[in-house]
Amino acid sequence: MSCTLLKGVCTMKFLMMIVFLQVSACGAAPMNDSEFAEWYLSRFYDYGKDRIPMTKTKTNRNFLKEKLQEMQQFFGLEATGQLDNSTLAIMHIPRCGVPDVQHLRAVPQRSRWMKRYLTYRIYNYTPDMKREDVDYIFQKAFQVWSDVTPLRFRKLHKDEADIMILFAFGAHGDFNYFDGKGGTLAHAFYPGPGIQGDAHFDEAETWTKSFQGTNLFLVAVHELGHSLGLQHSNNPKSIMYPTYRYLNPSTFRLSADDIRNIQSLYGAPVKPPSLTKPSSPPSTFCHQSLSFDAVTTVGEKIFFFKDWFFWWKLPGSPATNITSISSIWPSIPSGIQAAYEIESRNQLFLFKDEKYWLINNLVPEPHYPRSIYSLGFSASVKKVDAAVFDPLRQKVYFFVDKHYWRYDVRQELMDPAYPKLISTHFPGIKPKIDAVLYFKRHYYIFQGAYQLEYDPLFRRVTKTLKSTSWFGC
């Protein structure tokens, strides 16, 4: 019998064992303080009455006291070896299910992935939150680690990924059962094949994106740290500290220790190409008939593509810079026909004819270009005239001749019932469109030497401008 819940194969006998474990765990009698402390030390500090020493040693050692001292030292408590109130209080704080001390025979030292490009898949979703919120939270959690390393992550919607993400109750097939609300919140496995690298979250918790309940983003960043090879830290400022505490996700930053530890495994991020070398624009800079092939934001800048080069500038700045496409991205061809950015992911997509390229943090991704037909276009489409990403709707609009297509970024699928006529659904806009820019909740639709400022909320054109107005011409 195949098992799709976890990587690998499980038998009926194994499933029955899982059920038995879950019933046993749920039906266990409440523990007193001493029993709870022994359970805690057994689970997180490798304590066990039947532990066989790896080396010859005295048989009258007090292993329980030694493990209590080890736990107290880890959390910065006075290492008395006594089960006092401060020690018990720490033990009762909700925490990660990964041990603080790894047994020498159980975990390879400095486990890491031996590749830069990793895949992940959210196997199922918690009912506590909207599906799109869960997708966004994990995308941001992975970005926390990709921002400080050369690692890159890609989401899969089917098949087995390097990192499988699962929400589950109680016993769920890995002999590391969840204990209900509070207690252990989640656990993850160090890098490797099979279940290694996976992250599991206790569905008994109330997962949220705020300070109420348990904040999914904070726990996800922590567990993905394990999935990438990090162990627990005894630094309370580290996201890899074992116990849970709320931090504001909008201002969250990795500690210096976290950055140093993850970079000791994977190195620093690949330095993006420099865009700080301005040069004088050509004489056609403010030509009255100047048009653009593609226009998009790239971070805080705006890129204006034309033939083999592009202008770039900061909105509001008098300076305008120009450089050749090949000087920044030697693998990208000239004559880009459409472009859009997903700023939250630091991703730039470039289109020419039947192919498209992905630029991640200004670095071209391998295994590109890809076919535009993989996005869901029909065979009749031979090129994309213009494209724009609307962050409020999380949709990409592709303009092709008299029609437009709409692509769902979260689902990574073309929306059904498309294409539709541009003139019908964008009143005041007539084909053909050269480029589209999203800026301050408006679309700027470039057609030859002019651009139309379009309000997508009220579906109307609000201004007509020269295409070169961005340059102060």
Swiss-Prot record:
Binding site for Ca(2+) 1: 128, 203, 205
Catalysed reaction equations from the record: Hydrolysis of soluble and insoluble elastin. Specific cleavages are also produced at 14-Ala-|-Leu-15 and 16-Tyr-|-Leu-17 in the B chain of insulin
Enzymatic class: hydrolase
One Gene Ontology biological process: positive regulation of epithelial cell proliferation involved in wound healing
UniProt xrefs under PROSITE patterns: CYSTEINE_SWITCH, HEMOPEXIN, HEMOPEXIN_2, ZINC_PROTEASE
Cofactors required: Ca(2+); Zn(2+)
Subcellular locations according to the entry: Secreted, Extracellular space, Extracellular matrix
Positions annotated to bind Zn(2+) 2: 96, 222, 226, 232
Residues the record lists as binding Zn(2+) 1: 172, 174, 187, 200
Endpoints of the signal sequence: 1-28
Entry GO MF terms: calcium ion binding; collagen binding; core promoter sequence-specific DNA binding; metalloendopeptidase activity; zinc ion binding
Functional summary from the UniProt entry: May be involved in tissue injury and remodeling. Has significant elastolytic activity. Can accept large and small amino acids at the P1' site, but has a preference for leucine. Aromatic or hydrophobic residues are preferred at the P1 site, with small hydrophobic residues (preferably alanine) occupying P3.
Similarity remark: Belongs to the peptidase M10A family.
Protein name (record): Macrophage metalloelastase
Species this chain originates from: Mus musculus (Mouse)
